[in-house]
Structures are given as C-alpha cells and as structure tokens.
Amino acid sequence: MNLSLPLNKDNSGNSGNSGNSGGSVCSSNNTLSPILSNSILSSPISSPRLISSSNNNNNNNNNNNNNNNNNNNNNNNNTINSDSNNNNNINNKPRKAGIQLDSDGCLIKRIIKEGYGEIPPPRSIVTVHYEGYLSNQVLFDSSVQRNSPFTFQMGTKSVIDAIELSISTMKVGQEAEIVTTQRYAFGKLGLPPFIPPNVSVIYKIKLLSYKLKSNDFTNFESLINKSKEEKEIGNQFFQKSNYKKSIRHYVKSIWILNDPEQTLGLNEMENKLLKDTLIILYLNLASCNIKLKDGKRGISNCEKILELGGNTTAKFYYRMGQAYSLNKQYDSAKRCLVQAIRLEPNDKLLRDELENIKKLQEENNK
C-alpha cells in the first residue's frame, strides 16, 4: 500500500473532519487512511504477529541506529529531536490516567512517558515510532519492529484522525497510548482483510522529532497556479458527473489558498484575486452539493461567499435558492430566486426555478 494517502472522505465526498455528523455517538461512515507499511502488507495477515519479549530485545538492538538518526537530525536548526540518549522503544504500561481528546470520549490518550519542549506547530513534518493493535491486543503494524520511523506532514490528511489529533498534543520524546473507536480510525468498513469492520484500535506512539515546514510556494503567482490546477481537475470530474471527486479537488484548491503562511502580506490586487478565486471555488462546491442533494452543505458554502464579501451575482442567488429548496426552506429559497431575477430579469431558467420552488412548497404544505 502506498503511503501517499488520499484525503479522508465522508459519504458526501466532502473532506472529512472529526466533528459529529449525526447518528450514534462515536460512530462514523468515514473510511479513513491508515498507517500501514508495505512490509506488513506484503506478508499474509492471517496469523498477525504479536508483541513478545523477543520483539523488545530486537528493539533494544536497534537503539544505536535510532540514536544516530536523532544526532543527524540535530544538524537541522529547525528540527526538534528527542534526546539521543533515550532509546526509541515504546514502553507498554501507561503511567497516567487517560486524557479525553474529543467531546464524546471516543479518543483517549494515556501518557506513558513525558516529553519536553513545545508541541508541533500546525503543518509540521513529524517523525514518530508507533505500534498499532486491534482491541484484542493483536499487533497489526509496527514501525518499531521494522526499525523504520514514520514521517509525515501534519494537516495533510495522510493518516487517520486518531494519529493526527494525538500527535498535535504531544511533545518531543513523549510516549503515549491512544485508544480510539472506529470514528477516528478505520471507519465502519475497516480495511479488509487487515482491519475488521467497525473496530476500536490502540496505538502506542512516540514523537521522535518535528521540523517546521518550508514554504511550498515562492510567490503568490505560483500559489494561484497550484490552486487552479486542482480546480481544473475538479472541473473535469464535474463534467463527468463525478461530483464527489470534484468536491475533493475543490476542497484541496481552497485549502491551498487558505494557508495564512502563504497569503500573509499580500497587496490589494493580490487579495482581490485571492477572494475572487475563493468565491468561484465555493460556488463550484455548492453546485456539487446541489447535484448530490445535499442542501445543508450547499447553504454553508454559499454563506462562505457572503462572508468573503464578494459581489453576489444572479448565479449565486440561483445556487443558494436551490440549496434552500433542497433543505425545504422554501421562503428563503423564493427570496433568493426573486433577487436573482432582479439581477437577470430575462433569464427564463430563473423564473422556471422560482415556479418549481412554489410548487414544491405547496405540495409540502398539503
């Protein structure tokens, strides 16, 4: 399995998040990307390997190699490393009571060993050792056994939410045990045949180091161009009626433009171009939401356009009216269509949509 993993997705195709989207507490329809290595997946999983004392001995034999890696990392001034005198083994017994990392108790962190310094800033590049267990203590993945620390960039949706959320609270050198339901792990579907459906998992994690991310874009023009590339891919999927994939690329395009590190200090012309580009992207997202009959998200994306303070067009009011109609907010939908017709009085499509909304409201009131 390639460790270059896709964005988390929910059933609507929108970028996943950790919030409760309805249904039972601690449940989710998300099928999230795991941390699983090629070496683990290349061998049969019918007899999963268990952590044993021999594994711990192997880990101890590899301490010198890990410490050498830490010493090399210290040459980078922007890299924060754990003490090279400490080995990279992960202790097995939590020393403190659990800390609830979410509002529903679906993600619990227990500190095994304290770290030092500051927690990683957003979008840092972090290096960790980890062990992943099913709830019956079966080990399904271990960077420790491979003597191969795992590195990824935070904020890129490249790991399951449980890993991302936990590491965002850890200091360098800290070791922790993470207990999570499927909501922040592999979702209701699991990852057959390696991870069963709808299971809780346990991770033991040690934060070895982090370094600040260097700028991806040297200037505003390259930032806009990268965003446009994602938007064009989204447009292509839209033309093919693949609205979920289209949403994915529109969201990524917005994510690029919403990075405060990249957009700080823009001049007036650049800020206008940034705002206009975001308005188009949110309008495209709303169109996808409407195609997928998701009025609630359609309204939300239209409201983001209002927050940006852009000039509202007939097309905007048309989309927002459609979204309100899907959400059965017919009075709001009619007001939007009336405003759209004021801006484009000769557009038959707008008048037809207004009549359609009136009919839907009448049927709903029967």
From Swiss-Prot:
Keyword entries, A-Z: Isomerase, Repeat, Rotamase, TPR repeat
GO molecular function, one term: peptidyl-prolyl cis-trans isomerase activity
Intervals holding TPR repeats: 227-260, 279-312, 314-347
Domain of life: Eukaryota
EC number(s) recorded for this UniProt protein: 5.2.1.8
Region (Disordered): 1-26, 47-97
Activity regulation: Inhibited by both FK506 and rapamycin.
Task performed by this protein: PPIases accelerate the folding of proteins by catalyzing the cis-trans isomerization of proline imidic peptide bonds in oligopeptides.
Family that this chain belongs to: Belongs to the FKBP-type PPIase family.
Stated name of the protein: FK506-binding protein 6
Organism per entry: Dictyostelium discoideum
Gene expressing this chain: fkbp6
